[in-house]
Amino acid sequence: MEGFDDAGVFFSDNFGGDNQQDAQINLQAVKKKYKEFIRTFNEENFFYKYRDTLKRNYLNGRYFLEIEMEDLVGFDETLADKLNKQPTEHLEIFEEAAREVADEITAPRPEHEEHMHDIQILLSSNANPTNIRQLKSDCVSKLVKIAGIIVAASGISAKATRMSIQCLSCSTVIPNLKVNPGLEGYALPRKCNTEQAGRPKCPLDPFFIMPDKCKCVDFQTLKLQELPDFVPQGEIPRHLQLFCDRSLCERVVPGNRVLIQGIYSIRKVGKPSRRDGREKAVVGVRAPYMRVVGITVDSEGAGAISRYSNITSDEEEHFRRMAASGDIYERLSQSLAPSIFGSRDIKKAITCMLFGGSRKRLPDGLCRRGDINVLLLGDPGTAKSQLLKFVEKVAPIAVYTSGKGSSAAGLTASVMKDPQTRNFVMEGGAMVLADGGVVCIDEFDKMREDDRVAIHEAMEQQTISIAKAGITTTLNSRCSVLAAANSIFGRWDDTKGEENIDFMPTILSRFDMIFIVKDIHDESRDITLAKHIINVHLSSNKSAPSEPAEGEISLSTFKKYIHYCRTHCGPRLSEAAGEKLKSRYVLMRSGAGQQEKASDKRLSIPITVRQLEAVIRISESLAKIRLQPFATDEHVNEALRLFQVSTLDAAMTGSLAGAEGFTTEEDQETLNRIEKQLKRRFAIGSQVSEQNILQDFLRQKYEERTVMKVIHTMIRRGELQHRMQRKMLYRIC
C-alpha cells in the first residue's frame, strides 16, 4: 500500500543503522541474482536468450528487455515471488542489473556513444488474466495481469524521473532528486535548511524546479474497458486508467484488445474547492490505476484475447471431428436461435457471417475484407431483433446497438477533452470495440441518414478515419455488420416496390446478403408456427434442460468453435471453383443463364464486382466451417444459392431496383423514358396532381409500380417534392 499515507513533505534520514546496512547488502545480493539470470539463462540449444536479446536491442537503439515470468520462476522461484509481491522495488533493481549487463556486453562502444542508456524491463506471463472487477485493495502494489479493450488514448507527455531544485532566496541547489514512477508527483520541501551567517532564514516554500536540469521520459495514459464477455447482464462495463512510459508508449490505439501486465497502484484523488475551483487532495482516499510493465496486443483482430481463447487439446480434437462430419453446416444453422421457427436460409446466412471469409492483403498494400455483412428487411414480428440478440450472445466478440440511440460518433469514434489534463483524447465507438467480431444494429431504418453515411468506410474498407481537434489517425473496424430494418410503411407492401425502403444505393451495395422477411398469411404455416410458439412458452415453465436438443450444439461449444475456426483457418478459393464462379458471373451479367419464371417476364438481374466478391466470401466461410483450406465447387454452389435467395430475390421483387447493378437494361430504358416525359410534362417551379400523372401514364400502358419508382427516385434526388398532403408534385429543378 505504498504511497497511501505519505505526508507529502521532503525529509532526510540521517540516522541510518545496522538494519539499513543489512537491507543494502540484501539488495546487492538480489541485483547479483538478476545479473546472473540475464547473463546465464539459456535454452536447450545453449542459446543465451536474454543476454543476446539485450545486446541486439541495445545496438539497434531499443533500450528495453522483455522477460517471461515462467523463465524467472524456473531460474529462481523465490526471486520471481519477490518480484510478484514487491514489483516497485524489484523492478528498479532489475533495471539497474540490466543496465550493468548491457554495459559489459556492448563495450567498447563507438565514439560519441559512451553514455549508457537506461534499460526498461518489460514483463510477460502465460497466467490467466484477472477480471477488472476482481481487483480489490489486497492487490495494491502487486503484479497483476488483466485483459480488456483500449477505449481511449492520450497524447505523449513528459515526466521527470530525476530533477534538481533551487532555493529562490539563497540560490542553494539540491541536485538529482529521485521522482517515484507512476502518476504520483513529487512534493517540494516547504523549508530551506541552509544556514548562512548574517542572513535571515529563507521564507516558506522557497524552492522551484530547474527544468533544464531534469531528466524526463515519455509517458501516456490509456483507458481500459473490461471485455464484454465478463460484464454481467444489465451492468455498465468497468474502466481502469493505465500509465505507460518509455517504450510502452504508442503501442496501442483505441479498439485494440490487450493483455496488460502491470503494478496495481493508487494515486491521490482531487476534489475541486468551492473558492477557486482548484483540486485539493482528499485525505485518506486513493483512486486505483495500473502502472503497465508489459502489453500483449491482439493485432489480427480475430478475437484471440477473449474468454474463449483457452482451448484444450481435447476440445481441439473434438472440433476437428465436428468439422469432418458431413452435417456440421446443417447442425450449426439449426443451433442458431433454435427457439425461432423457420427462417432456415437466414440462419444459414448468419452462420456464414459468424465464421466470415478470409481477409487478404494484396501485394500493393491494399486489403480485401473477409467479413460478411447481412441486412434483414421486412415486416415487424418476424423475429429479426431476436436473431440479432442471439448473435450478440453466440459471437465471441459482439456489440449490440439500436439505430435510434446510435449516433455517428457512437458507432465510429469520437474526440473528447480529458477533464483532468484538458487535452483531447480519442475514444472508439461500437464498430471499433467490435474489431474482430460482429456489430448488430437494430432499427437500422430509424437511424439518421448522416449517421448511416458515417459507417460507409467502416463497412467496406474496415477502417475509421478521424480528423478532429488536431488528431488525424485511422482506427481498425474489422467487423461484420448484421442490421435489421422495417418497411417505411410499417408492413411490407408488394405494390409499392422500392418505396418500401428508404436506403441509398451506396449502403445497400455494401451488404453481401439482403433478405426480405415477409409475414406470409398461410393457414398450415400459421398452425405450425402457433404450435411452436406455444411449446416454447410451455417448456420455459419447466426447469431448463441440461443438454441441448438432438442435433443441436450448446451455446458455449458453438462460441468456442467459431473462435477456433476464425483463428486456425483462412481458406482460399480453389482454381476449379474460381473458374465455375467466373462462368456463372458472366452468365448472370449477360442474362443468358436465367429462364423466364413469371407469366409476364422474369429477366436475370446482373450483379456487380462487389456482389461477386460477396459470393467469394460466402464460399470461403463455408470452407472455414469445415476447416478446409480451399473453397470447392460444393461451397460455391451453396454460396450462389444463398445469394440467389437473398439479394437476387430481393432485387427481382423490384424493392432494390435503382441500387447499383440491381436493374435490368430493359427496365432502365423504361424508367428513363418515363423520367423524360415527366420533365417535359411540367416546368421547374410548377406543380401537378400526382393522381393525374399516374392516370396519364396508365393510359399509355405503363405499370403503376414503374411510374411510382421514377417519382420516388426523383424525389430522393431532390428534383421533385410532395406538397399538400402528398397529393401534389412540385418540380424543384
From Swiss-Prot:
UniProt keywords, alphabetically: ATP-binding, Cell cycle, Cytoplasm, DNA replication, DNA-binding, Helicase, Hydrolase, Nucleotide-binding, Nucleus
Residue sites binding ADP per the record: 368
Motif (Arginine finger): 509-512
Subcellular locations according to the entry: Nucleus; Cytoplasm, Cytosol
Function: Acts as a component of the Mcm2-7 complex (Mcm complex) which is the putative replicative helicase essential for 'once per cell cycle' DNA replication initiation and elongation in eukaryotic cells. Core component of CDC45-MCM-GINS (CMG) helicase, the molecular machine that unwinds template DNA during replication, and around which the replisome is built.
Entry's Gene Ontology molecular function annotations: ATP binding; ATP hydrolysis activity; DNA replication origin binding; helicase activity; single-stranded DNA binding
Assembly mode: Component of the Mcm2-7 complex. The complex forms a toroidal hexameric ring with the proposed subunit order Mcm2-Mcm6-Mcm4-Mcm7-Mcm3-Mcm5.
ATP-binding found in the keyword field: yes
PROSITE patterns xref list: MCM_1, MCM_2
Substrates-to-products reaction catalysed: ATP + H2O = ADP + phosphate + H(+)
Protein name (database record): DNA replication licensing factor Mcm5
Reported impact of residue 384 to A: Greatly reduces complex helicase activity
Any Gene Ontology CC annotation: CMG complex
One of the GO biological process terms: DNA endoreduplication
Keyword Nucleotide-binding: yes
Enzyme Commission code(s) on record: 3.6.4.12
MCM domain location: 328-534
Classification lineage: Eukaryota, Metazoa, Ecdysozoa, Arthropoda, Hexapoda
The protein's enzyme class: hydrolase
Family: Belongs to the MCM family.
